[in-house]
Amino acid sequence: MEEELLPVSMIRQYFFCPQIPYINLVLHVVEPETESMISGRMSHEKFRAQHLPREVKPRHIETEVPLSSPKLGLCGILDALVETVFGELVPCEMKNSSIGSGNPPLKDRAQLTAYAMLVEEQYRKTVKRGVLFYTEDGRKVVTGINESMRRLVVKAIREIRGIVEAERPPEKKNLSACASCWYSRICYSASSSLQTAHRVR
């Protein structure tokens, strides 16, 4: 029996907090869409040439690209795949957020790397870089796709599978984001309930 493919979004969620894949995939609880989420989704424009930094010169841009790989165990829809004038393939993702003058967070870089790996698998071409476009501040960031990040993604896939198979929540991280995270009301109760059950045994 083939394993169900993990959505690439789970990679991003895992690097934000490993509790979320547990809640989504084991407890089958997903954060309900808020008005701002719906508004953001409805206004989410397609990736265009003007979203690219100058060093990426497009010959062709394909948007909403479905990708999947039983070998990697991943599937997802890439915002855009750019073929440059030199024949290079560059995966691109739009984020409805801002990063100011800082570097893209690990969760975004890991998700982009996962998409790059899917592109490599499907198109049989090596991907050396990708682009992250942040809609709120207009930042266009070229991100290198390296072996270190590829290994990190493979490890994350393996660990997410382990979480699902064990049906046990991973250890909580002490994140400042917990206070504003919708899932905090579930992950705290789920973890404490499970710990209580184990003590009873």
PLM regions with names:
Residues 1-60:
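Charged, glycine-rich intrinsically disordered N-terminal tails and low-complexity linkers that flank
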Residues 60, 120-201:
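Metal-dependent nuclease catalytic regions and adjoining charged, substrate-binding loops involved
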Residues 47-89:
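Active-site metal-binding core of divalent-cation-utilizing nuclease and nuclease-like domains
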